[in-house]
C-alpha cells in the first residue's frame, strides 16, 4: 500500500482525530494543526505519536495530502497555502469516503444516538471480525485487512451526502441544526437523499414518522418495540444493572440479550446492531456475549464517583437527548436525587428549542444552567441562559466562580450535559469535592 503524508487542518476535532488515528494505524505519516487549548481528543493523538502543531502556513510542505476540517473555510491561512503549493485537498467527508469504500461499510446517521450506536457496533463487530471504525468521540482504528468499516455519518451541513455505504443505520430524524436546515422536512429530505446512496439495506427506527416513508432503492428494515417492526425487542426488563430483552426478526427469535447500558434508547441502539449482525450472517451467541461486554462511550453517560456523589458526564445538547440521559440516570439510581448542570450549546439551538430544553430539564430534581457556549460561526445572539432558567421552576444560574452551590447536595447524582466545554465546570466541581 502506498504510504502518504496526511496533514489535518483542525486535527483535534472529534471526527478528525478519529480519522487521523485510522490513517496512522494503516502506516501513513500523519500530523496536523489546531488551537492550543487542550481537548479530550489530544492525549490519544499524542500517545500514538501524531504531531499536533499550532496553525502556521509554513507547516505545509510539498507532497502532503491536506484534510480540511469542517469548521475551516477556504480562506484559512493554511488552506490558502495548500492551494498555493498545489497540494491535494480533501474535505473531511471526502477523506472518510476514500477510506470506507474498500470494505463492507456501515454508516450510522441520526440526530441522536449516532456516537453510541457507532461505538456499540464497532465493539461488537471488531470482537468477531477484523473491523476499522471511526467514532465521533475521537476514537478511530484502522485495519487494512478489515472486513467491516463502521463510521459515523453526520447530517450537519449535509456532510453525509459524501458517503455511499453498503448499509445505513438511521436512529432518528430531528430538527437539530437550525443554523443550517430550515425545518424538519428539510432534514428528512437530506436523510432520504443519503438513503438513496446506500448500496444494500437501511435499518431505521420504526417509531420515527420521518423514516417510515423513505423513498429509496434498497430494502428498509425497521427496528423497535412495535409488532410491525422487522427487528423487535420484547419482554424488556430495565433494572439498575442494565436492560435485558428478547430479540426477534419478524417471527424468528434471535435470542435473549443483555446490555449494561441505561435508558430505552440503549435498547434501540443495540437492536440496530443486532440487525446488521443478522444480515451479515454472524453468530448470534458471539454477538450476545459482546453486547453484554460493552461498557460505554466517552462523554456518553460516563460516570465518576467521589465520596457520596456520582458525577455523570454526557454530550446531551438537544431536548430529547437530555430527556434520555435523565431517564437513564433515574433507571440506574432510582432512589437518589438527580441534579442537572446544563451548558447550552450555541445561541441558535437554545433559541429554537428553549421550551423543549425547559421541559426536559424539569425532569431533574434541580437544574443549574451555565453561560451559553458559542461556536466558531456564532458567538452572540438574542437569547440568554437566564431566559431558560425562567422557564424551569427552581432552577439557578451557575458559573466557574459559583460551582460551590453544588456542595449542598449529598448522595446525589450530578449530571453535567452539553456539547461545548462543560467538562471545565465538572473538573472544578471534582476539585471542590476532593
UniProtKB/Swiss-Prot annotation:
One of its GO terms (molecular function) is UDP-N-acetylmuramate-L-alanine ligase activity. GO terms for biological process: cell division; cell wall organization; peptidoglycan biosynthetic process; regulation of cell shape. The keyword Metal-binding does not apply. It is found in: Cytoplasm. Its EC number is 6.3.2.8. Its main location: cytoplasm. Cell wall formation. HAMAP family: MurC. This is UDP-N-acetylmuramate--L-alanine ligase. It comes from Limosilactobacillus reuteri (strain DSM 20016). The lineage of its organism: Bacteria, Bacillati, Bacillota, Bacilli, Lactobacillales.
Amino acid at each position: 500500500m502506498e504510504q502518504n503524508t496526511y496533514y489535518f487542518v483542525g486535527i483535534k476535532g472529534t471526527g478528525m482525530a478519529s480519522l487521523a488515528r485510522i490513517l496512522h494505524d494503516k502506516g501513513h505519516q500523519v500530523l496536523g494543526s489546531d488551537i492550543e487549548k487542550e481537548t479530550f481528543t489530544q492525549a490519544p493523538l499524542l500517545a500514538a505519536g501524531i504531531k499536533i502543531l499550532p496553525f502556521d502556513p509554513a507547516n505545509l510542505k510539498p507532497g502532503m495530502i491536506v484534510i480540511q476540517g469542517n469548521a475551516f473555510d477556504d480562506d484559512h491561512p493554511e488552506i490558502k497555502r495548500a492551494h498555493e503549493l498545489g497540494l491535494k485537498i480533501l474535505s473531511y467527508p471526502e477523506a472518510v469516503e476514500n477510506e470506507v469504500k474498500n470494505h463492507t461499510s456501515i454508516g450510522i446517521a441520526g440526530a441522536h444516538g449516532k456516537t453510541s450506536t457507532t461505538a456499540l457496533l464497532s465493539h461488537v463487530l471488531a470482537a468477531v471480525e477484523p473491523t476499522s471504525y471511526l467514532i465521533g468521540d475521537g476514537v478511530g482504528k484502522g485495519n487494512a485487512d478489515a472486513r467491516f468499516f463502521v463510521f459515523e455519518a453526520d447530517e450537519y451541513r449535509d456532510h453525509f451526502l459524501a458517503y455511499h455505504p453498503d448499509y445505513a443505520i438511521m436512529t432518528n430524524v430531528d430538527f437539530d441544526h437550525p443554523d443550517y436546515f430550515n425545518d424538519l422536512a428539510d432534514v428528512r429530505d437530506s436523510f432520504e437523499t443519503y438513503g438513496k446512496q446506500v448500496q444494500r439495506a437501511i435499518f431505521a427506527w420504526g417509531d420515527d414518522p420521518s423514516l417510515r416513508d423513505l423513498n429509496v432503492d434498497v430494502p428498509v428494515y425497521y427496528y423497535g418495540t412495535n409488532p410491525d417492526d422487522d427487528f423487535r425487542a420484547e419482554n424488556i426488563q430495565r433494572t439498575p444493572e442494565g436492560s435485558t430483552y428478547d430479540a426477534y426478526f419478524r417471527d424468528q427469535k434471535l435470542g435473549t440479550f443483555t446490555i449494561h447500558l441505561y435508558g430505552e434508547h440503549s435498547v434501540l441502539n443495540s437492536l440496530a446492531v443486532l440487525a446488521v449482525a443478522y444480515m451479515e450472517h454472524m453468530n448470534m451467541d458471539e454477538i450476545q456475549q459482546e453486547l453484554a461486554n460493552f461498557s460505554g462511550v466517552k462523554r456518553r453517560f460516563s460516570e465518576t464517583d467521589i465520596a457520596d456523589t456520582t458525577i455523570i458526564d454526557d454530550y446531551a445538547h438537544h431536548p430529547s437527548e437530555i430527556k434520555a440521559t435523565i431517564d437513564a440516570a433515574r433507571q440506574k439510581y432510582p432512589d437518589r436525587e438527580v441534579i442537572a448542570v446544563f451548558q447550552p450549546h450555541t445561541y441558535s439551538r437554545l433559541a429554537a428549542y428553549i421550551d423543549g430544553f425547559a421541559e426536559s430539564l424539569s425532569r431533574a430534581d434541580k437544574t443549574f444552567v451555565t453561560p451559553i457556549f458559542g461556536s466558531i460561526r456564532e458567538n452572540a445572539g438574542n437569547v440568554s441562559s437566564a431566559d431558560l432558567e425562567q422557564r424551569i421552576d427552581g432552577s439557578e444560574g451557575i458559573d466557574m466562580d459559583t460551582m460551590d452551590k453544588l456542595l449542598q447536595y449529598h448522595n446525589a447524582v450530578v449530571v453535567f450535559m452539553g456539547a461545548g466545554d462543560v467538562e471545565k465546570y465538572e473538573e472544578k466541581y471534582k476539585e471542590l469535592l476532593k
